[in-house]
UniProtKB/Swiss-Prot annotation:
Gene3D superfamilies noted in UniProt: 3.30.70.260, Beta Polymerase, domain 2, cca-adding enzyme, domain 2
GO molecular function, a single term: [protein-PII] uridylyltransferase activity
Keyword field: Hydrolase, Magnesium, Multifunctional enzyme, Nucleotidyltransferase, Repeat, Transferase
EC number: 2.7.7.59, 3.1.4.-
Its biological purpose: Modifies, by uridylylation and deuridylylation, the PII regulatory proteins (GlnB and homologs), in response to the nitrogen status of the cell that GlnD senses through the glutamine level. Under low glutamine levels, catalyzes the conversion of the PII proteins and UTP to PII-UMP and PPi, while under higher glutamine levels, GlnD hydrolyzes PII-UMP to PII and UMP (deuridylylation). Thus, controls uridylylation state and activity of the PII proteins, and plays an important role in the regulation of nitrogen assimilation and metabolism.
Region (Uridylyl-removing): 370-722
Positions of the ACT domain: 723-802, 834-912
Family assignment from sequence similarity: Belongs to the GlnD family.
Species in which this protein is naturally found: Novosphingobium aromaticivorans (strain ATCC 700278 / DSM 12444 / CCUG 56034 / CIP 105152 / NBRC 16084 / F199)
Regulation: Uridylyltransferase (UTase) activity is inhibited by glutamine, while glutamine activates uridylyl-removing (UR) activity.
Upper taxonomic lineage: Bacteria, Pseudomonadati, Pseudomonadota, Alphaproteobacteria, Sphingomonadales
Name listed for the protein in its UniProt record: Bifunctional uridylyltransferase/uridylyl-removing enzyme
GO biological process: regulation of nitrogen utilization
A Pfam family matched in the record: GlnD_UR_UTase
Residue segments, region Uridylyltransferase: 1-369
Gene of this entry: glnD
Amino acid sequence: MLPRIANQRAIVDRRALADAVSAAFAEQGDRSRPAVVELLRGALDSGRAELARRLEARPSAGTECAHGQAFLVDQLVRVIHDHVVGKVYRASNRSTGERIAIIAVGGYGRGEMAPHSDVDIAFVTPIKPTSWCEQVIEAILYFLWDLGLKVGHSSRSLDEVVRMAKSDLTIRTALLEGRYVWGDRDLFDAASARFWNEVVNGTEKQFVAEKLQERNERHKRLGDSRYVVEPNVKEGKGGLRDLHTLYWIGKYIHKVRDASELVDVGLLTAEEYRAFRRAENFFWAVRCHLHAITRRAEDRLTFDLQREVAMRMNFADRPGKSAVERFMQYFFLQAKQVGSLTGVFLAQLDGQFARQKRSFFASLRSRRKKVGPFFIEGGKLGVPAEDTFQQDPVRLVELFAVAASEKVEIHPEAMRLARRDAGLIDAAVRKDQRANALFLDVLTSRNDPETVLRWMNEAGVFGRFVPDFGRVVAQMQFDMYHHYTVDEHTIRAIGLLASIEKGEAKADHPLASEVVGKVASRRVLYVATLLHDIAKGRRGDHSVLGAEVAMKLCPRLGLSAAETELVAWLVRWHLLMSATAFKRDLADYKTIADFVNTVQSQERLRLLLLLTIVDIRAVGPGVWNSWKRQLLGDLFVSAEEVLRLGHKQHGRAERIIAKKKAVGAILKERDNLIGTVGRQLGDAYWIAEPEDIIALNLQQMDQALGELLSVEAHWYPARGATLVTVLAADHPGLFYRIAGGIHLAGGNIIDARIHTARNGTAVDNFLVQDPLGRPLNEASQIERLKNAIADALANRVKLVPQLAARPLARPRADAFDVRPIVIFDNKASNRFTVIEVGARDRPALLNRLARALFEARLIVHSAHIATYGERAVDTFYVTDVLGEKVDSEARMKAVEKRLLEAAEDRKVKDAA
């Protein structure tokens, strides 16, 4: 039965609607159908409008909106049924078999619907449906379909209902929430009685096991974290479906009719039930807003919708945190609460089954083993008494330290008590030496720190013990780059670090796996990983603010002054290595020298490499790739050589000789090319390019002698990209035209080096991937690349309009406000001016920027492209036409203006 709906007739007046339908039929008879549909549609539209008005007036009243939607559909179904049975297929003398019960099932049965939810209906008949029953059911369905409702329906006899419910979990779950809507009430009661007696009775344990398995598979399918930044409100981890699962299990086992009765049967406390209702109401509000905004059954809270839902639900900006970030933080806190409720619910369930002589989870209950103030029983860590933590709040930290050292799960009842008593952690506990030592044991555990820290976070102990961490719990970053909340990202980074240390990541991270064994201070590395994003969401640079947090927190954790200083340095500079590797020219010695000048020691270099890798990896799937691994490895090796040899490192001439020798080893019997075509290439080329690319370039130059244009493309596994080499007569605008051709072929340039041989031939090397970071390695893709470049250079295509028409690989980037920025740096290189342009990522951005540089009469010598979700950062090493740096203020202002115009989101007329 639905809860009482306030002012029902403002939503729909069933009697008035039924009278209007009857009047239409009386007037038009069999020709009345269009008029009846129009009346019904009008009632549906006005009902939806009234519910939308109520949601706008009370934007957090989610369950009220959901019940209102179900009420509206109920009334329409009743009017349609009475019209069909009483007028369209009126039967004066029906047999006992000509009876129909209309049962709402699934979410509709529960009385909870979003504006565009499916309408799930079961038509039940006493025996196999007669022709009259079939006609009535079909007519009812056609009316519902004509209203534009998406109807899920079944038509079965009583026996079929029972038989199918026994064999199909989905049908059983749907019928579990079966609710009488209209029709034959006695038939509904008979179906309900048989369902409980013949289907449910004796299958409770099987149902629970199947529902939990179904839940786990759903989580895995949707991203097994409740902190995915574009969550599915209905199906995602910690969402509505998880709450429904608890209700289904409670109903199946204890026959509860409402979630409030979960308290009466001992599965939730009154306080936990209030948390259940709070989360449910909030998620229903979000879901109803999503349907209202999109006008469809949209349950995914995507970036473009998050801002609007936050606004509708009256979230406002606060210093350092936008309205959408505050809204999403509240969302994730509710999802976290659902996870906690699930744990305690299942713990109580386990206990109830255990009291029936056998544990539900079938764990053999061995003799208790005492561990400090706790015990281990059945492979789980438990607490002996309700007041265990109240006696000594330090035990709240000790619980997790014991779980880490003993490699055991924490019993859900112990988690429940820890969650309840987390508030006992005060300033005295935080200062306690033993508590801090225990926390450090968890953080630096050689077993599984990620899992235990996640438990600690779920219980609320982590954020209470480290309040700065508590500030980033459930905090999202409103961008497309970070896939997880800050706390989840941090915990994952710690887990990745532990995995590298155990040698489990050698294939993916050979350098890191080798370096980790040379690190002098594990504690520094783990604490720095914990703190690297600790100041996210505050006003100011989170790296600088995080270093300040480290200086205060590390001594409390028991770190020495030297360790504290090193942690603070790592937090302050945790973005330095990736910024240098991905946005600077590693072949320019000044890049390495500047980097080393900041790093200053091999220990810092090792620690920074490891922190950088786990930070990038923990951002989310698809962010790490072999190209990034190669760049970080190149930077590490170059920096380590400078730190190790200092001024004794090889000079420019010696490095070129060594490079030529290495190239000769690759070319083997063709090593004569070094002295023939290789003569055309200057020293800068030999220093900049790696040996394997030089070998390929020399062979291509030899084969292309006398040709006006040569384009080659090879799959380049070492870089995780396709190497595209273009040989052509050098002329102004060559670079932007090549870039345009590559973009037209579906390529995304991630790195480019531009050289001019002594004979005037341009030797340009590009590393190319598809827009999703994958290589273009199929024969058809490579052929398309070659043809597109040739067409662009021959002016056979109008680049700009064609590029502008290409769809964006990441269309959701439009949800973000990315203001273009241009930065000039004349200190980053001895020979070149370095220009860094940040802008919204979109098709052919590089082409636009390169064209702007060409129009500003600048020569591009190398380009380095990095993307961070919706934001692209393109870095160019340039000179003027005379080979000089751009250093006049007026010139820089003029170039900046051109680049900002090119970076703007607007259509550009083709002048190519």
